Amino acid sequence: MPNRAFKQSNIRNFSIIAHIDHGKSTLSDRLIQHCGGLTDREMAEQVLDSMDLERERGITIKAQSVTLYYTAKDGETYQLNFIDTPGHVDFSYEVSRSLAGCEGALLVVDAAQGVEAQTLANCYTAIEMDLEVVPVLNKIDLPQADAMGVAQEIEDIVGIEAVDAVQCSAKTGLGIDDVLERIVRQIPPPKGEPEEPLQALIIDSWFDNYQGVVSLVRVRNGTLRAGEKMTVMSTGQSYQIDKVGYFDPKPHETGILHTGEVGYVISGIKDILGAPVGDTLTNTKSPAKEPVPGFKKVKPQVYAGMFPISSEDYESFRDALGKLSLNDASLFYEPENSAALGFGFRCGFLGMLHMEIIQERLEREYDIDLITTAPTVVYEVEKTDGSIVKVDNPVNLPAVNDIETIYEPIVEANILVPQEFLGNVITLCVDKRGVQTAMAYHGKQVAVTYELPMAEVVMDFFDRLKSTSRGYASLDYQFKKFEPADMVRVDILINGDRVDALAMITHRDHAEGRGRMLVDKMRELIPRQMFDIAIQATIGNHVIARSTVKQLRKNVTAKCYGGDISRKKKLLQKQKEGKKRMKNLGNVEVPQEAFLAVLKVGK
């Protein structure tokens, strides 16, 4: 274990940028193993993906960090601080967070697959943040690997030198030495003054039931010592620092972090919002003048209502959301009340995958059963009196005669797709009301840029893009502007009563089709009662689709055989009146599957 007071010129902070399945987690496993971070016995697959969900889906969701010591060929020992990054488009915010703590990034590209759109987006983020990007070609042991072709593709599409890109195979361990040497040689050491007042950037925070809030920090200037008092700059709160150390990948307490190092701080913060991600820690006695320029605050793009199935879970649901939002700064939530579903929260997410992951984490880690309403994006509504309101819930859309114009959010989507699937992708984009703005050919790949309504992208665009291109197309998108659109609210009425949780905002062209699909689906899901149930889809007072769940009837004429017809008529008339009375008094139970049906509309 080298001496802790490490030369600043021998510290290297880096991240790995890669698309899902290009071997980022495996490469990080190899680096840890090579530098002796873990024994062979402890080497679980995907060491840094510590969440079960991450291992199951094979994706990285949270940022993690590990400190390794590597003795290079020049005889010097280097401290490598590696901050893991997620690759999925929904977690791009986590990526910019991880990159804010680094001076360099390894751009890992699968030598058999080539460059993908998300890798490209994350790579541009790294270049904007002035990081040194080192291209690495992985999976070089595969028979279909084409190192030269992919290196050329990196130069064409990304625009960085890749002729002498490092070639390695994370699976077999081939070329790992070259990767480490390249990190030491190409990535610059951290800048920063040990003598200046302390500035430490919080890259991530999570809640530990025994120790309170644990923060992962990168020290920009000064030194962080256990026992001293620190101040969180945005809140002005001060805390006593209890423990300081780094991960190798297990926590290793050292009591001090020097300039340029990455490690963890525990200071007994019990309040979940005590150490927000992206904030700066400084010394209480000699505070820094200004915080470290953090990274962009991210706005939720998709909103959905979440309601616990049993109302007793409401309190624990609120606590669980609080703990998750500490660790996931992009999650937004506020209380909401629905006539159909009771008390719950309106939550904001970065995208559909983010929403699924949060829902699954709530159900798994906190054991809460939830119903989620249909996701919507944020619309801007200009009212007739000239005021503009933002609407993220169909229920809050003003009355039709109060609306002047509805503006919907448009995203710029960059899609990379092999040439043979280009036709399918264009058809899909046109179907989703997209407008093509650019197209460029790079070798076998085509890069197309579309302006698409965010509402269409949110619903099921990602899944359909993957299925029309056999999984080869990749997508990256960012918000561009608001644009006027002919949007309407479709309400679902059951026996004349509006069900608020089933309302949706959609384009007028699609309203009838979606209304019809939803009504038909509801008819299958609502159980038959002793009276007819009318299910209607309406826009304002105009009914656009209707369907009826037929009543259950007893055969009242069974006991009459032969005899007078008027006897039968009398019995049927009596039954009819009874049903009518029932219909006025009866209320319809809507099963939970019916609320989930809304999510499937449009598929």
Swiss-Prot record:
EC numbers for this chain: 3.6.5.n1
Broad class of enzyme this protein falls into: hydrolase
Pfam families (alphabetical): EFG_C, GTP_EFTU, LepA_C
The keyword Nucleotide-binding is annotated on this UniProt entry: yes
InterPro entries, sorted: EF-4 (IPR006297), EFG_III/V (IPR035647), EFG_V-like (IPR000640), G_TR_CS (IPR031157), LepA_C_sf (IPR038363), LepA_CTD (IPR013842), LepA_IV (IPR035654), P-loop_NTPase (IPR027417)
tr-type G domain span: 9-191
GO biological process, one term: positive regulation of translation
GO MF annotations in UniProt: GTP binding; GTPase activity; guanosine tetraphosphate binding; ribosome binding; translation elongation factor activity
Localization in the cell: Cell inner membrane
Family: Belongs to the TRAFAC class translation factor GTPase superfamily. Classic translation factor GTPase family. LepA subfamily.
Record protein name field: Elongation factor 4
Native species: Idiomarina loihiensis (strain ATCC BAA-735 / DSM 15497 / L2-TR)
Name of the gene: lepA
